[in-house]
Amino acid sequence: MIAVIMLLSFTSAYAQEAEETSDSAGWWQQTKNRLGNIADNGAEEVYLSGYAYHGRNTYTPERIRELNEKAWGIGGGRTFRNADGNDESLYFFGIRDSHFKPQLMAGYAYEWVFSVPKTPIEFSAGYTAMLVSRQDYFGGFPFPLPLPIAGIGTKKAKLMASYIPRLSSNKGNGDVLLLFARFEVD
């Protein structure tokens, strides 16, 4: 019985000490804190999509005529300009995919921002990690997808691009450049 009490006392003291240490939060708590900060303090944004370019060396002219390159869509999100001057975003987005079906996306993006001196213009480059739901993959079940992103514009309005690479030597998949705009509405 004394051993159990000593063990519980030791465990309790150890747990309290761990809670007081800033490094003890761990990656899960740090991730939750970061995402919570974006959600609470980020600027509200609207996303508009309109064009998906399919690589002409990947698809035959006949196939390109069958594909939808007018990837109309809308979404929303929040972007927080962090202490390093870079953008972190949480977003959701729905577009009409290459096969005229709905494609739903939700994710996180990180962009390193490079300002043009003495102008409001800035360039950005980074990555996004998202969950995507498409009818032609996994029956619409969401799957993870990391992609590169880039942008040009101002803090309040940017033309953005993301590239879906060709993942195999087979022609007819990937090699798509998606263009969209991001507008701050706060």
Identify what each model region corresponds to.
Residues L48, I74-R78, F92, A106-W112, ...:
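Residues on the lipid-exposed face of transmembrane beta-strands in outer-membrane beta-barrel proteins
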Residues A15-R78:
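Short glycine/proline- and aromatic-enriched beta-strand/turn motifs that initiate or cap beta-hairpins
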Residues N82-E88, K156-A161:
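Repeated loop/turn-to-beta-strand initiation elements of outer-membrane beta-barrel proteins
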Residues Y53-T58, I95-H99, S115, M130-D136, ...:
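Sequence/structural signature of outer-membrane beta-barrel proteins
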Residues Y47-Y51, Y91-F93, S124-M130, M160-I164, ...:
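Transmembrane beta-strands of outer-membrane beta-barrel proteins
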Residues N33-A43, R81-D87, V113-S124, D186:
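Short loop/turn motifs that connect adjacent beta-strands in outer-membrane beta-barrel proteins
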Residues A52-H54, G174-D186:
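Outer-membrane beta-barrel "beta-signal"
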Residues N68-I74, F100-A106, F141-P146, G153-K155, ...:
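Residues that define the transmembrane beta-barrel architecture of outer-membrane proteins
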